Amino acid sequence: MGMKQLYIFFKSNHISFLVITIFILVSCYGNVRLFSQPVRVGVILPLFEDSEDEAKKQFGTEVLNGIKFSLSEYYQSHGRDVFLDVRDSKKDIETTVNVLTELAGNDSIICVLGPIYSNELAESADIAFMNQLPVISPTATGDDLADTHDYLFQLNPSYDIRGRIMADYLYKELKMRNFAIISEESYGVNFADHFETEVKKLGGNIAAYETYKRDAKNINDIITELHKVILENDLFINPSNMNLKQREKLERSGVRYGLLDSLISQKTNVSIYYLFGRNAKKIIDTLNIKPYQLKSDSVKFIQGYFDVIYIPISNPSEIGMIVPELYSNGLNYFIAGTGDWNNEKALDENKVYMKNLIFESEYYLDENSPQLKELRSRLQKTDYTLDKSFLFGYDSMGLILHLISEGGTTRQLMYNDLLKVSSYDAVKSKITFDRKRVNSELNILTYDHGLKRICTY
């Protein structure tokens, strides 16, 4: 067929040719967003729109502000092809179920951001599954939610993940083996039980596990129990009772002169494990120094049997009750905690009582981050406040909009793309969904004249 005949064929059959072309494109690129079609994102938050109590409205409003600001930034570079359908849960399970059912019935809704609370998310599971609708909670931390219900996603790591991550970090990265747990008895145990299970799975030893009531005024009874464990298992020496030759041996074996001098002047019994670690017995034998166990009434000593004390609190106010008592009883050498320790004011008030502290948290602001600096600059032109609640909304909406821009414009495409999210750089933390659809990234933080991030783990 010559060029003239080919031209006549295409001209006379241009409609058929166009249809065939579109069919081929759709067949080959069915998952690609060929045309900019508007999509809707459902939002379910405790807004208490019919209440005059501003305190009740604050949290949900701040999260919504973050969502709206993230969307406004998206509009600047992508145009207005994404819309919100915002519903008020009133922090009520029945209301949550009703509004989610309504959203699920609208085919233009490709996913739902919210609800906020774990009990609300649990009741959303069947609706999400039956309608194949991704339901993404920015805050829920409960166990057995996303990991046991398809189409649910948790951007906030669960109790299970938090407990396991701290155990993994302490055991694998810091090489700790002997652990004590002091846990608040109703909320803290959600973390502590998973921590205990993971430590044992790794081969570590939970030498003590004690709990306290949320309204406790002190932990004297717990201190007594920890002392019993120490006195039964720890071995001590007292450099003030040694001759010069023995002291020189200690110094040559790696004991710092400043520490040795302090132990001598204060006549302190010190654990050989504190000085030499897990190989202490072997080292102390080569020095021809005999360690001993302390008597039951001994008070003044530095223990080394516990590598770390893991303390899942229920409120930052408990820090001021626990840490000074640990300090007074020589048990403050190394403390590990949960995200509730992420309170700079409480830590600053108790900094004199802490030597080494690490804890996990889903929230950390890196002031050197260009991403954070740019966000602060943009927010100066608005009435919004950059806080934790705002970022729960901003980061979660940012992830959804990122996936939409990459082609996740239907429920199934959004679901598939969410499953692949790995090391997404949100402002307050990274986001990686594990195979159970729960974010498995946490900041490992410490406190040393201010909060500092050690790593993301």
PLM segments and residue spans:
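Extracytosolic ligand-binding ectodomains
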Residues: 2-10, 15-457
